[in-house]
């Protein structure tokens, strides 16, 4: 049985929104929302074709941010507030890619959760 392709609904969004970047040691997730928190576009390093240890590189972070930003730009978003979470290597590259895709960054806030001496961290890697 042939599958029917659905046409994606194009909804114009407000020109201002937020970008949530989660840069972990293994992957990069970029979610762009409007000011109410409704998701406009999202992307991840795995969605853009990166596999394994290539997902946590600054280049993967740049490509991921560009793809999410272009989709949001096409829907009418122009100004963003950036929230960064996590210790990953592609944090700065992601912000530069957002600016390169045409979005104006109005503020940058680091919301990485820091424990007040909570759980014991994982042991150090010996490479």
Curated annotation (Swiss-Prot):
Q: Does the keyword RNA-binding apply?
A: yes
Q: Which GO terms describe its biological process?
A: translation
Q: Which GO terms describe its molecular function?
A: rRNA binding; structural constituent of ribosome
Taken from the record, one Pfam family name reads: Ribosomal_S11
Keyword tags: Ribonucleoprotein, Ribosomal protein, RNA-binding, rRNA-binding
Q: Which domain of life does the UniProt lineage start with?
A: Bacteria
- A GO term from the CC aspect: ribosome
Keyword rRNA-binding attached: yes
Q: Which HAMAP family match?
A: Ribosomal_uS11
So what family is this one in? Answer: Belongs to the universal ribosomal protein uS11 family.
Q: What function is annotated for this protein?
A: Located on the platform of the 30S subunit, it bridges several disparate RNA helices of the 16S rRNA. Forms part of the Shine-Dalgarno cleft in the 70S ribosome.
Assembly and oligomerization: Part of the 30S ribosomal subunit. Interacts with proteins S7 and S18. Binds to IF-3.
Q: What is this protein called?
A: Small ribosomal subunit protein uS11
- Species of the source: Chlorobium phaeobacteroides (strain BS1)
């Amino acid at each position: 049985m042939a599958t029917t392709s659905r046409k994606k609904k194009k909804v114009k969004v407000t020109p201002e929104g937020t970008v949530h970047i989660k840069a972990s040691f293994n992957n990069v997730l970029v979610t762009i929302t409007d000011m109410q928190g409704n998701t406009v576009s999202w992307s991840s390093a795995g969605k853009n074709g990166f596999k394994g240890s290539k997902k946590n590189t600054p280049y993967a972070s740049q490509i991921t941010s560009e793809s999410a930003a272009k989709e949001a730009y096409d829907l009418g978003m122009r100004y963003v507030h950036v929230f960064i979470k996590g210790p990953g290597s592609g944090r700065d590259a992601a912000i530069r890619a957002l600016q390169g895709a045409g979005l104006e960054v109005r503020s940058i806030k680091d919301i990485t959760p820091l424990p007040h001496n909570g759980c014991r961290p994982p042991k150090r890697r010996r490479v």
